[in-house]
Design a protein with these regions (language model features):
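Ubiquitin-like/PB1-type beta-grasp interaction modules and other compact soluble beta-rich domains
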Residues: 1-105, 116-117, 129-130
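Auxiliary tRNA-acceptor-end handling modules of aminoacyl-tRNA synthetases
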Residues: 53-56, 60-74, 86, 95-105, ...
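Conserved NTP phosphate-binding and transfer environment spanning the P-loop NTPase/kinase superfamily
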Residues: 289, 411-489
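Hydrophobic anchor at the beta1->P-loop junction of P-loop NTPases
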Residues: 294-296
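Conserved lysine of the Walker
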Residues: 304
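Hydrophobic positions on the alpha1 helix immediately C-terminal to the Walker A/P-loop
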Residues: 307, 311
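Short beta-strand-centered segment that lines the nucleotide-binding/catalytic pocket of NTP-utilizing
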Residues: 317-335
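Conserved nucleotide-sensing/catalytic segment adjacent to the nucleotide-binding pocket
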Residues: 332, 336-379
Length: 489
């Protein structure tokens, strides 16, 4: 009898032997008891792998759970697949034209269905029930690789024309497809092992569609109640509408636009729309002479500084004299900056801002006094008081930007009638296809990499290592206050 081949696998601080071709899923089951949250992916010698993959060599393995960013995204991606499968099961293929995952609202996704299907409470109850049935059945989420031309033909047959168009512009020769039973779809990223992992979700009817509510990363077994974010939702819905009007609903549509030679006009239209909206905001501010402080808030690298300068131009066109001020210049001295639980400087919390100095100078300006605004040197880690003093005249207005500008604690000493609050973010309404979103955080991380390298003396490695802390800070310090804004952009 032929002896089975064995491989040595290092996990944590121990080395164990496993038979060749054992799945990572079987290895993960052995270690699940040591983890608070479910293991959903593995790193094999530093390379991310799905659990259905098999052991092929001596290696070192580390586990990824639903409480890790990569695992959390894989959970949401797989949950999207489960939802789409359930919708088609309940409604029937002939009654559906499109199932669209539009954008995130908190920890959930706003979705719509077009076709002969009416999205009401009864329909959502049946879809949710079907999703639970699929979870109970613990069906494998299978993966296969096909030639791109074959994928184009398949999705044409399935009526998923967004994917058919997407793959027409794909340069690689092969595509990975996933299936639950015989239902097949494409997802951009790794998936979970089976439907049995997808226990935590809730559907809420909202506006013209519904929200697929899922756990947050810090509580991966708890589904929070859906909280409507009306202003944010309307801004995103309007952006989706404009994309549809221009027939650029997905990346495939954008690629079509580029190859047809229409992209320059598309860019000009987008710029014109943005400038028109900025002009409208400036007119709103100019119509209220009591406003002396324009407060612009948004997450990291969302375009606050650029927006503040563009708004300033429009304010000048309305006869005002704007003075842009960055809250970042009011950071505490480096030696006074608080640290997080890991001993790293916490630049994202309001505690990193010298609120006393900020309040003092803003009140002095409101009282007609001269003030020298500080300039923070991020390399040296301290404020410098240089430049000409500032004094507000009748037509002067301060345009203040920073991640905490909507937090009432920052401007509690200033009267509400003197403030106009704006929330801005580089939101992504364009998706890869109807079932694969492009998270707005991805674009902001790229922007931050460039900014930190150019102006803050930080390497790409340092910026990426700090990003999880930045994201936690946004969830705590920024997003809870976005509905306080007078307008969103």
């Amino acid at each position: 009898m032929e002896e089975k081949r064995m491989y040595h696998v290092k996990i944590k601080n121990e080395v164990k032997e496993y038979e060749a071709a054992i799945t990572y899923h079987d290895i993960a089951k052995e270690y699940q008891k040591d983890y608070e949250h479910e293991i959903v992916l593995v790193f094999v010698d530093g390379k991310l792998q799905e659990l259905h993959k098999r052991l092929k060599k001596d290696c070192e393995i580390s586990f990824v759970t639903t409480a890790d960013p990569i695992g959390h995204e894989a959970y949401k991606r797989s949950m999207s697949f489960l939802l789409v499968k359930a919708v088609y099961d309940v409604a029937g293929h002939k009654n559906i034209d499109k199932v669209r995952m539009h954008f995130a609202i908190g920890p959930g996704y706003y979705c719509t269905i077009t076709g002969e299907t009416r999205v009401d409470d009864d329909f959502l109850e049946r879809v949710e029930s079907r999703m639970h049935e699929l979870v109970e059945a613990d069906l494998s989420i299978k993966k296969r690789t096909v030639h791109t031309d074959e994928a184009i033909g398949l999705f044409g047959q399935y009526g998923m024309y967004d994917k058919e168009e997407l793959f027409r512009y794909r340069r690689v020769s092969k595509v990975n497809l996933y299936s639950i039973n015989e239902f097949e779809d494409y997802y951009y990223g790794y998936m979970l092992y089976s439907t049995g992992y997808l226990k935590y979700f809730k559907l809420y009817r909202y506006d013209e569609g519904f929200v697929l509510q899922m756990p947050e990363i810090d509580k991966p077994e708890t589904v929070p109640h859906f909280e409507a974010r009306t202003k944010f939702f309307q801004v995103m819905k309007e952006s989706v509408k404009w994309g549809d009007i221009q027939e650029i609903e997905t990346v495939g549509g954008l690629n079509r636009n580029i190859t047809s030679g229409d992209v320059q006009e598309t860019v000009l239209v987008q710029e014109a729309m943005q400038e028109r909206r900025i002009a409208e905001i400036a007119q709103m501010i100019a119509s209220r002479p009591e406003i002396r402080f324009v407060l612009i808030a948004g997450p990291s690298s969302s375009g606050k500084t650029t927006f503040s300068h563009r708004l300033s131009v429009q304010l000048r066109a309305n006869g005002m004299r704007p003075h842009p001020i960055a809250v970042d210049n009011y950071f505490k001295e480096r030696e006074e900056t608080p640290k997080d639980e890991k001993g790293n400087y916490n630049f994202e919390g309001l505690c990193a801002v010298d609120i006393d100095l900020f309040e003092k100078q803003m009140q002095e300006l409101l009282d007609g006094k001269e003030v020298i605004i500080p300039n923070f040197d991020f390399v040296k880690g301290h404020k410098e008081f240089v430049g000409s003093p500032l004094k507000l005249g009748e037509h002067d207005i301060l345009v203040i930007e920073g991640i905490h500008c909507l937090n009432p604690k920052l401007t509690k000493a200033l009267a509400d009638e003197n403030k106009f609050k704006i929330y801005i973010s580089a939101l992504t309404q364009l998706n890869i296809d109807e079932h694969n979103r492009i998270p707005s955080t991805d674009g902001r991380l790229i922007r931050r990499l460039v900014r930190d390298a150019r102006t803050r003396g930080a390497s790409a490695t340092k910026t990426i290592s700090m990003w999880p802390s930045v994201r936690r800070g946004e969830e705590k310090n920024i997003f809870p206050y976005q509905e306080y804004a007078d307008v969103m952009f």
